[in-house]
Amino acid sequence: MVSIWTIALFLLGAAKAKEVCYEQIGCFSDAEPWAGTAIRPLKVLPWSPERIGTRFLLYTNKNPNNFQTLLPSDPSTIEASNFQTDKKTRFIIHGFIDKGEENWLLDMCKNMFKVEEVNCICVDWKKGSQTSYTQAANNVRVVGAQVAQMLSMLSANYSYSPSQVQLIGHSLGAHVAGEAGSRTPGLGRITGLDPVEASFQGTPEEVRLDPTDADFVDVIHTDAAPLIPFLGFGTSQQMGHLDFFPNGGEEMPGCKKNALSQIVDLDGIWEGTRDFVACNHLRSYKYYSESILNPDGFASYPCASYRAFESNKCFPCPDQGCPQMGHYADKFAVKTSDETQKYFLNTGDSSNFARWRYGVSITLSGKRATGQAKVALFGSKGNTHQFNIFKGILKPGSTHSNEFDAKLDVGTIEKVKFLWNNNVVNPTFPKVGAAKITVQKGEEKTVHSFCSESTVREDVLLTLTPC
């Protein structure tokens, strides 16, 4: 039996398509695949550039606090600005119900200025994003065309190569970047920060962000649970050459605080309120921004699933290495292999989000006991707290392995401290030791070994030195 919904879609598709044309950026239709489909049932045309009012706000190392407005139709605005044609350009494009002057965009620019000289352009299309979702999703096409127009102007008037450009788009902004990239041959890079699911997941590549939109496309997924029933705003669909799923890509640590503590945020009431409404979705740009200042703090591991990653089946990095999620993903040697690549990692629950993964194996000695075996690493750059490696029967001669994510890179490991404990009192006061502990950092092939012939009672530290 044909459903009423199917009939309605048929009638929508059968209606004559409409089209609007705008000077310098072309024509836009509401024909398939843009409308009249199961994913995009409503026929909605994008607004005009004048109504959307897109602005290009330039920040540079010379003007990190006050923007200069650039116009894609007026090259003189480039000449009158601090735009440097010998430096890279990174555009940051916001998403639904957001704006180009929101703090997070400028904060991201300022982090860039700490590590490089760069043109940082915040794309403000708030008039086109602060409307109904369906309308905003269609306005994406015009905003993307305007970004492409800006890139074309830079190329035509200043011989500025698109290969020098990165488009960073959050939410709907990721698909704005995709539209711009599809119109700009040779675009260097697009980074999608939790590309939005609704109206885009499952659509043809021409509608959404995809790997053909730039020479390199990387995507960070932080809110990939289904929109219905879990209210996940981001897509689970792989849309880049490298797709990163931190913490599994659905539930970010630190996002399940109670309402009051979430709203009364360290970054202010407004940012806290945003976090309360869409914490997982917003984590993507927070991870990216922090990655700029942590070149090696977001190493990501190829894995079939997050469950496999959490089961310690994807460690250490393969021979080709591991990419860094975020700003330095483009340094990965095999970033544009033919197959889309899926990567996993864990982050912290609040700033600082960076983590360094270690694999540890313990060979026990001493008496048989029940309890937990823990290890802390001490290195040239600092030390970790105690991590639980094994819980159960501590049997001499047995070897137990685990992985953990440390808050810092300890540097060259100089010693390891072993501790065991049990909440149940043992009247025999057994002594347990670690005859050997091996440690490997995820991105390195070297396995470091530490030994001791001693044993200790419960809650007494045992120091192991290189052997």
UniProtKB/Swiss-Prot annotation:
The record lists the membrane-crossing segments as none
Any single GO molecular-function term of the entry would be: calcium ion binding
Keyword Signal found? yes
User: Per the similarity annotation, which family is this?
Assistant: Belongs to the AB hydrolase superfamily. Lipase family.
Signal peptide residue numbers: 1-17
- Subcellular location per the Swiss-Prot or TrEMBL entry: Secreted
Organism in which the protein naturally occurs: Canis lupus familiaris
Look up the record and report any one GO term of the cellular component aspect. Answer: extracellular region
Q: Where expressed (tissues)?
A: Detected in pancreas (at protein level).
Which biological process terms from the Gene Ontology are attached to this UniProt entry? lipid catabolic process
Instruction: Please name one Pfam family that this protein belongs to.
Output: Lipase
Q: List the disulfide bonds.
A: 21-27, 109-120, 255-279, 303-314, 317-322, 451-467
Identify the residues that the record assigns to the PLAT domain, covering every copy.
356-467
Q: What is this protein called?
A: Inactive pancreatic lipase-related protein 1
Write out the entry's keywords from A to Z: Calcium, Disulfide bond, Glycoprotein, Lipid degradation, Lipid metabolism, Metal-binding, Secreted, Signal
Query: Which superkingdom does the taxonomy of this entry point to?
Result: Eukaryota
Q: What does this protein do?
A: May function as inhibitor of dietary triglyceride digestion. Lacks detectable lipase activity towards triglycerides, diglycerides, phosphatidylcholine, galactolipids or cholesterol esters (in vitro).
List positions binding Ca(2+): 205, 208, 210, 213
Q: Does the keyword Glycoprotein apply?
A: yes
Looking up CDD domains in the UniProt record yields:
Pancreat_lipase_like, PLAT_PL
